[in-house]
Amino acid sequence: MTTATAGLAVELKQSTAQAHEKAEHSTFMSDLLEGRLGVAEFTRLQEQAWLFYTALEQAADAVRASGFAESLLDPALNRAEVLARDLDKLNDGSEWRSRITASPAVIDYVNRLEEIRDNVDGPALVAHHYVRYLGDLSGGQVIARMMQRHYGVDPEALGFYHFEGIAKLKVYKDEYREKLNNLELSDEQRENLLKEATDAFVFNHQVFADLGKGL
């Protein structure tokens, strides 16, 4: 089956495969998932994630309001608020927002998401949306189990990985891919979306690289 007949979802998977593999197997994430780090490092990851999810969801709000990809940009996927509740738990209720310092990679990531928001760039937003949320619906479930197994993280601090508004994850993911395939895009928009998705994985890899510095 060629990408031309397979649809955008398959094109995205194929065109981002190398960047996805690199991000997924970063040293930081490998160490975290294999039990070589600790709750402190997991907390740092989630704090940085809160910064870029906040920016991502503000961009999604702007694009959704424009009428582009409304059904795809489902607010049930939003993670920033539940992530904040997790961080309250991980920080034992102490104030954490004011002490977070965005890493250089997160600054770059957030700047790009804010640019997408300001330009109401629907295809670019969909690329970042796909990379983050489809990953959360898939590999995120593994991360939650590993955080409990290796570090004893309280399940109440892992709400980020549980999508309360989504009953069946596989069905939802299949529907998400079908919505991707049904997007009306020009050839230029499609090409830009595919490139942006690879860029999104690169941003994520750089975030993990920054987190791994000094360990």
Swiss-Prot record:
Positions annotated to bind heme b: 20
Keywords of the record: Heme, Iron, Metal-binding, Oxidoreductase
EC primary class: oxidoreductase
GO MF annotations, alphabetized: heme binding; heme oxygenase (decyclizing) activity; metal ion binding
Disulphide bridges: none
Catalyzed reactions per annotation: heme b + 3 reduced [NADPH--hemoprotein reductase] + 3 O2 = biliverdin IXalpha + CO + Fe(2+) + 3 oxidized [NADPH--hemoprotein reductase] + 3 H2O + H(+)
Protein EC: 1.14.14.18
Domain of life according to the entry: Bacteria
InterPro entries xrefs: Haem_Oase, Haem_Oase-like, Haem_Oase-like_multi-hlx, Haem_oxygenase_CS
Pfam families with a match to the protein in the record: Heme_oxygenase
GO biological process per UniProt: heme catabolic process; heme oxidation; response to oxidative stress
Family per similarity comment: Belongs to the heme oxygenase family.
Stored PANTHER family: HEME OXYGENASE (PTHR10720:SF0)
Name by which UniProt lists this protein: Heme oxygenase
Gene: hmuO
